[in-house]
Amino acid sequence: MKYTDTAPKLFMNTGTKFPRRIIWSMGVLKKSCAKVNADLGLLDKKIADSIIKASDDLIDGKLDDKIVLDVFQTGSGTGLNMNVNEVIAEVASSYSNLKVHPNDHVNFGQSSNDTVPTAIRIAAVAEVTNRLLPALQQIISSLNKKAEEYKDVIKAGRTHLRDALPVTLGQELSAYADAFQHEHEQVMNILEYVKELPIGGTATGTGLNSHPEFQERVINEINRITGLGFKPANRFRAMRLLTDLLLLSGALRNIAVDLYRLGQDIRLMFSGPLTGLNEIDLPTQEEIAGSSIMPGKTNPVTVEATLLISAQVVGLDHANQFASMLGEFELSMGIPLVGYNIVTQVNFISEALEKMSRLVIDGMVANVEKMKRYAESSPSLITIVSPVIGYDKATEIGKKLNKGMSIREALRELGYSDNEINKILDLSKLVKPGFTAK
């Protein structure tokens, strides 16, 4: 394998290999191209059949150890394409007892400039469809179930990390369920853009040295194999610009940001048990020791691992922004890096969503009495009488509350009866619109 053997001297050798999904997508693409070229009478059927058989080996993961070239290579991804071409040619030759050539046969009617941009989009769509979308549905379902379970559990609201008006735990969880639902819809919409494939563009998008029907036929064959509904792209756009993948990266970043926020809220509610909030318990987090020196300590380890994942996904999105700007005229120069990053982002965020759902949210237990006690002792409750006595007087009462006077005592000084005060301090009325003091 002349190219593959020589390239490591010139490329980077960081040990960063292409993920399984991209190797799989290259196998799907090479298989599809071989079949179409044979059907068009442009490739000997026996050679095509041997390429298809070798491509199946690549699809099934049997040749992964032979895809050795680093992600940090030529910006077109020629290293990946030629590595795959040479591996398939070698295996196909052994199957057919014919001399299968990596360029003349495996790469017939193709260029690295259209194959790798096509393959990374196939990989992205497949990974999102098979992993991310189910993981999003899982966390949406988990959050909605917990929101319903705790819809009447009142807790202190907090803004700026200071006491604020009460909310319910269900309301807080519903916010994240709604956010992830919107992000699920956003990803679905973006995916339609990513499904546009530039195969058939060959070197510069014109399609020179490929059959006029090649693009459409190859995409039909890819759809037959994957069932993912790909369609032809404007080849000139999809070979020079990676904007569709950048949109997907941005959607993954948004999921990571909201997942980070959810994780931070859970960590704070789990803080304690004696000197923190201690508003929730997370039984699964007690399965391993939280400290190597403090016996009995438990930490929100799954949540913290999720925060690290979120940080990495956001960082990879920033790298994608920069890599998407690389290139001039007919071709992007960030193709292998963006492809690698996107699949990595999808894998990382899907893993985090799945484990947050199963190990954290599903098992979350509210400390109901602790939450109620915090809610009833919050100085922000003065807000409920503000519409009646005015903002200035309410502020004065707030100062008294901060000095230790209870809100009941303050309201009595204003002439409210105990019966009226009980009605005012019915916290269930404070978590929905209305003027409870009137």
From Swiss-Prot:
Cell location: Cytoplasm
| A GO term, aspect molecular function | fumarate hydratase activity
Relate the protein's function as given in its record.
Involved in the TCA cycle. Catalyzes the stereospecific interconversion of fumarate to L-malate.
**Organism lineage:** Archaea, Thermoproteota, Thermoprotei, Sulfolobales, Sulfolobaceae
Q: What is its EC number?
A: 4.2.1.2
Family designation: Belongs to the class-II fumarase/aspartase family. Fumarase subfamily.
Active site positions: H160, S291
Q: Which EC class heads this enzyme's classification?
A: lyase
In terms of pH, the activity is described as: Optimum pH is 8.0.
Domain of life of the organism encoding this protein: Archaea
According to UniProt, the reaction catalysed is: (S)-malate = fumarate + H2O
Q: What else is known?
A: There are 2 substrate-binding sites: the catalytic A site, and the non-catalytic B site that may play a role in the transfer of substrate or product between the active site and the solvent. Alternatively, the B site may bind allosteric effectors.
Q: What is this protein called?
A: Fumarate hydratase class II
Per the record's keyword annotation, is Transmembrane included, yes or no? Answer: no
